[in-house]
Amino acid sequence: MKAIMIVYNQAHTEKIEYMLDKLGIKGYSLWENVQGRGTSSGVPHLGTHAWPEINKSVITVVDDEIVDSILNTIKKIDEINDEVGIRAFVWDVLKTV
Protein backbone atom coordinates (compact mmCIF):
# COMPACT_ATOMS: atom_id res chain seq x y z
CA MET A 1 0.00 0.00 0.00
CA LYS A 2 1.00 3.58 -0.63
CA ALA A 3 -0.04 6.89 0.87
CA ILE A 4 -0.39 9.67 -1.68
CA MET A 5 -0.58 13.27 -0.56
CA ILE A 6 -1.72 15.75 -3.19
CA VAL A 7 -1.25 19.47 -2.53
CA TYR A 8 -3.01 21.68 -5.04
CA ASN A 9 -4.31 25.16 -5.76
CA GLN A 10 -7.98 25.25 -4.81
CA ALA A 11 -8.74 26.00 -8.48
CA HIS A 12 -8.06 22.28 -9.12
CA THR A 13 -10.70 21.07 -6.63
CA GLU A 14 -13.21 19.78 -9.20
CA LYS A 15 -10.46 17.99 -11.16
CA ILE A 16 -9.18 16.26 -8.02
CA GLU A 17 -12.68 15.22 -6.93
CA TYR A 18 -13.36 13.88 -10.43
CA MET A 19 -10.08 11.93 -10.45
CA LEU A 20 -10.81 10.33 -7.07
CA ASP A 21 -14.29 9.31 -8.22
CA LYS A 22 -13.14 8.06 -11.63
CA LEU A 23 -10.38 5.91 -10.10
CA GLY A 24 -12.76 4.52 -7.46
CA ILE A 25 -10.91 6.06 -4.52
CA LYS A 26 -13.46 6.33 -1.73
CA GLY A 27 -11.28 6.90 1.34
CA TYR A 28 -9.32 10.10 1.83
CA SER A 29 -8.73 12.99 4.22
CA LEU A 30 -8.93 16.60 3.05
CA TRP A 31 -7.36 19.76 4.44
CA GLU A 32 -8.59 23.17 3.32
CA ASN A 33 -6.83 26.53 3.58
CA VAL A 34 -3.36 25.01 3.20
CA GLN A 35 -0.68 27.67 2.90
CA GLY A 36 2.69 27.32 1.22
CA ARG A 37 4.85 27.88 -1.80
CA GLY A 38 6.69 25.67 -4.25
CA THR A 39 10.34 24.84 -3.88
CA SER A 40 11.52 26.15 -7.23
CA SER A 41 8.81 28.17 -8.94
CA GLY A 42 5.40 29.69 -8.57
CA VAL A 43 3.99 32.28 -6.24
CA PRO A 44 3.19 31.73 -2.56
CA HIS A 45 -0.32 30.59 -1.74
CA LEU A 46 -0.86 32.24 1.62
CA GLY A 47 -4.45 33.49 1.57
CA THR A 48 -3.30 37.04 2.33
CA HIS A 49 -3.91 40.36 0.63
CA ALA A 50 -0.48 40.19 -1.00
CA TRP A 51 -0.70 36.47 -1.88
CA PRO A 52 -4.43 35.68 -2.03
CA GLU A 53 -4.34 32.20 -3.53
CA ILE A 54 -4.76 29.21 -1.22
CA ASN A 55 -4.20 25.47 -1.48
CA LYS A 56 -5.97 22.33 -0.44
CA SER A 57 -4.42 18.98 0.37
CA VAL A 58 -5.76 15.45 0.22
CA ILE A 59 -4.20 12.21 1.41
CA THR A 60 -5.35 8.75 0.46
CA VAL A 61 -4.02 5.23 0.96
CA VAL A 62 -4.24 3.03 -2.12
CA ASP A 63 -2.98 -0.25 -3.54
CA ASP A 64 0.38 -0.06 -5.31
CA GLU A 65 -1.24 -0.84 -8.68
CA ILE A 66 -3.16 2.45 -8.82
CA VAL A 67 -0.29 4.80 -7.92
CA ASP A 68 0.93 5.34 -11.49
CA SER A 69 -2.60 6.16 -12.68
CA ILE A 70 -2.91 8.81 -9.99
CA LEU A 71 0.51 10.31 -10.71
CA ASN A 72 -0.14 10.35 -14.47
CA THR A 73 -3.41 12.18 -13.89
CA ILE A 74 -1.71 14.69 -11.60
CA LYS A 75 0.97 15.28 -14.25
CA LYS A 76 -1.70 15.91 -16.91
CA ILE A 77 -3.49 18.39 -14.65
CA ASP A 78 -0.20 20.18 -14.00
CA GLU A 79 0.64 20.35 -17.71
CA ILE A 80 -2.65 22.13 -18.47
CA ASN A 81 -1.47 25.15 -16.48
CA ASP A 82 1.75 24.74 -14.55
CA GLU A 83 1.33 28.15 -12.92
CA VAL A 84 -1.72 27.07 -10.91
CA GLY A 85 0.21 24.44 -8.97
CA ILE A 86 -0.25 20.81 -8.00
CA ARG A 87 2.16 18.25 -6.51
CA ALA A 88 1.87 14.66 -5.35
CA PHE A 89 4.04 12.80 -2.86
CA VAL A 90 4.07 9.03 -2.31
CA TRP A 91 5.06 7.11 0.83
CA ASP A 92 5.14 3.42 1.65
CA VAL A 93 2.52 2.35 4.17
CA LEU A 94 4.13 -0.37 6.25
CA LYS A 95 1.37 -0.91 8.80
CA THR A 96 -2.14 0.26 9.52
CA VAL A 97 -4.67 -0.34 12.29
Region roles according to the model:
Residues 1-97:
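Positively charged, small/polar-rich N-terminal and surface patches that mediate targeting and assembly
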